[in-house]
Amino acid sequence: MPKKSMEILTESMFYVLMALMKETMCGMEIAGFIEKRTNGRVRIGPATLYTVLGKFLKEEYIRETEVEGRKRTYAITAKGIQAYREETQRLLCCLRDAEEEDRERSIVHE
């Protein structure tokens, strides 16, 4: 069965939703949040950011709350919150699987 386009979020998508879970933000604030939250490990450029925002608007994961000239402010929707929480759970399951695999591997190699 083919997966829905937004079923699994990319790292950039995940962090954009994380930023908007905190508060409404404009694009530059989102990029700044991501860079600060990840200690510079993830830097999202304007092209990627606005592509993600466009997809999220289309899928109704976010909505525009304010438009001042070219500056747009975004807020997460209930659908976006659900997607963020589902992705968080998926990632936690991946981490648990990796930890269990590491434990099993260390037992075998002892």
What kind of region is each of these model predictions?
Residues 69-88:
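Basic, amphipathic "hinge/linker" alpha-helix immediately C-terminal to the N-terminal HTH DNA-binding motif
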Residues 57-69, 75:
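Beta-hairpin "wing" of winged helix-turn-helix
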Residues 85-110:
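Amphipathic alpha-helical dimerization/coiled-coil segments
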Residues 1-8, 94, 100-101:
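Intrinsically disordered, low-complexity serine/threonine- and proline-rich regulatory segments
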